[in-house]
């Protein structure tokens, strides 16, 4: 009986090993996708910046362009933060409503 359980235990260990590896690969893929996206954004930023910078511009002009771009990006970040807060609030409200609906459905089950 002990011999019969050993292959099964080995199968479980192999399954766990494979499952962990699969999860690790998924995390690595997600991490690489974030790095790709971040670097693509950097390339786009540099492309945009090169469109604004013209030969003969002073350093002050270039710094002004960079400051303006930074302000625009900070405004976008603020907008996304506000949007996420609104979505989180809506999600919490929906969770409360769903919980209330679930409690209402459970009341008739208790009486039965």
From Swiss-Prot:
Entries under InterPro entries matching the protein: DUF496, UPF0265
Coiled-coil positions: 22-42, 70-104
Keyword field contains Cell division: no
Record's subcellular location: Cytoplasm
Originating organism: Proteus mirabilis (strain HI4320)
HAMAP family: Pole_loc_TmaR (MF_00683)
Function: Pole-localizer protein involved in the regulation of several cellular processes.
Predominant subcellular localization, coarse grouping: cytoplasm
Family classification: Belongs to the pole-localizer TmaR family.
UniProtKB keywords: Coiled coil, Cytoplasm
Cytoplasm recorded as keyword: yes
One CC-aspect GO term: cytosol
Transmembrane segments: none
Name of this chain's protein: Pole-localizer protein TmaR
């Amino acid at each position: 009986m002990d011999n019969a359980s050993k292959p099964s235990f080995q199968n479980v260990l192999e399954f766990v090993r494979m499952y962990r590896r699969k999860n690790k690969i998924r995390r690595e893929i997600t991490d690489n996708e974030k790095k790709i996206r971040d670097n693509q954004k950097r390339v786009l930023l540099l492309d945009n910046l090169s469109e604004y910078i013209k030969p003969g511009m002073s350093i002050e002009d270039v710094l002004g362009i960079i400051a303006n771009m930074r302000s625009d990006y900070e405004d976008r970040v603020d907008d996304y933060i506000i949007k996420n807060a609104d979505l989180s609030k809506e999600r919490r409200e929906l969770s409360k409503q769903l919980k209330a609906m679930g409690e209402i459905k459970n009341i008739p089950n208790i009486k039965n």
